[in-house]
Amino acid sequence: IMARRVAVIGGGCSGLTCIKCCLDEGLEPVCFESSDDIGGLWRFKETPEAERSSMYRSLVVNTSKEMMCFSDFPMPAHYPNYMHHSMFLNYLRLYAEHFDLLKYIHFQTTVLSVRQRHDFSHTGQWEVVTENRDGHKETQVFDGVFVCSGSFTHPVTPLSAFPGIDTFPGKCCHSWEYKDPHPFHGKRVVVIGIGNSGGDIAVEISRTFLSTRDGAWIVSRSSTRGLPLDMQLTRLNSLLMQVLPRPLLNWALERFYNQKFNHRLYGLQPSHRYSGTKQHSTTACT
């Protein structure tokens, strides 16, 4: 019996793990990566590239290494709890090398289309059209498709929502374009939004004004006794968050995070409670 062929679109973090999972299940993975290397989001580029994720030079991972690593491949012991993005990229390279995944990846190959075959209702098969760097197009049939192309490739810039933006004489840019603070030296800068990237950039840029519509709960990467925050995500705590009344849970969590600094004194007190809303907290090195 021939192994079922599975297409994996993207050679980043998710793509690599999908290749590994396919091999574990006796499937035949074929990965298509449009760039010339693995890593996806975690590959730093001096200049942002269209249709690709982008990050800034100083970015540090907000998840501790014990929680960030794959269950079958621990992080190197000398890695810090919260690592620089370059260290995580190196970890992905070590992972790909250890499990011999690179031979399943077709680099500089773009997926043009993915369609169900005419007999999909009987076979469950997909028709995938790709184009390599030489412009050669190829159509292949697969029994399954993993889409691992990422979700941060297109910056969202709702500038039309800000009255007067058309007459603003300064420069407007998205965090997708931001690499380091040097172009903003000596300038007055407003950072709109207090997500993780907004918080990081506000710290880096000199003389910054941070603008946030609703405020945010600021969560430190380090919790009690200096342990990584995500080590508090135990089964017991998870159970408590499910069974405790929402008002009591919010009171306890907000009291805990206000011990680091008083959100109201710093003008960051959110208009929403900590739990039970769509807006997530902001992780920072406080």
Each model region followed by its residue ranges:
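Surface-exposed beta-strand-to-loop junctions
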Residues: E66-M75
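Active-site-lining helix/loop region of Rossmann-like oxidoreductase modules
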Residues: Q232
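Flavin (primarily FAD) cofactor-binding/catalytic cores of flavoenzymes
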Residues: A3-V61, P74-L227, R235-T286
